[in-house]
């Protein structure tokens, strides 16, 4: 199979069901003439809903080029004309309103009516062994959100970083109580090249009692490595600090998080930054029906804030 056909196959297989779509649309209130920013385009579900419910235009960002291509194909198949959509292969931490947004007749960047961020890893990324996000199937220790990026992979972290660096991220990003034991066991087991190798090493490192839980001992380690590789929390902090500059007065930011580290950052920023007015005192969670339909939705939390006038 040639490269073009392989890429097409990936796009056709890229199916990601967006979470809390109805709640996002309800809070962002798309209206005719409105412009919105989707900083985590993924499968295009949130953007499609906004465009179908009244939004005039959407700027979509994604670090993953496969997701970007799949979303573009999905939106085109839904009848969304190209002039209503502007897509960028971009980390949202690098977004610049003047460069990447819509412009007025004077060439100035136009602030958005609303922004949506659906954080974390998508189902297609988790389900593709070659991406290295999951230990359910053997794959390379990669974990880059953008597989084309020239950056450290999970294998680089596991095999080259000092053990103290591993302990640090396992504690900070994985909240792992056996971080030191696991890090030293990894150091003794180097080199490690695959997801299943790493999962086995973690399994051996933890006490027998810790192996009997519902959650595999490697789950937090994989989360910590993924966050470190992609600098996810740093990117989220940048988004929360910069988003008021990208919004019109009264414009809204909707953030969907999937673990407590993300949710705490969002909650703290919304409550302490005077530029935000909190619209969701408590996070919104998916209904039981949505959780049954989409297992990924179970840990999702939505917080929304408006830019102060």
Swiss-Prot record:
Keyword Cytoplasm: yes
Binding site for S-adenosyl-L-methionine: 44-46, 62, 102, 118, 125
GO CC entries: cytoplasm
Recorded GO MF terms: rRNA (cytosine-N4-)-methyltransferase activity
EC number: 2.1.1.199
Alphabetized Pfam families for the sequence: Methyltransf_5
Subcellular location: Cytoplasm
Region span, Disordered: 289-309
InterPro entries documented for this protein: RsmH, SAM-dep_MeTrfase_MraW_recog, SAM-dependent_MTases_sf
Catalytic activity: cytidine(1402) in 16S rRNA + S-adenosyl-L-methionine = N(4)-methylcytidine(1402) in 16S rRNA + S-adenosyl-L-homocysteine + H(+)
Positions of disulphide bridges: none
GO biological process, one term: rRNA base methylation
Keyword vocabulary terms for this entry: Cytoplasm, Methyltransferase, rRNA processing, S-adenosyl-L-methionine, Transferase
Enzyme class: transferase
PANTHER family xref list: 12S RRNA N4-METHYLCYTIDINE METHYLTRANSFERASE, S-ADENOSYL-METHYLTRANSFERASE MRAW
Main function: Specifically methylates the N4 position of cytidine in position 1402 (C1402) of 16S rRNA.
NCBIfam families in the record: 16S rRNA (cytosine(1402)-N(4))-methyltransferase RsmH
Protein name per UniProt: Ribosomal RNA small subunit methyltransferase H
Species this protein is from: Synechococcus sp. (strain JA-3-3Ab) (Cyanobacteria bacterium Yellowstone A-Prime)
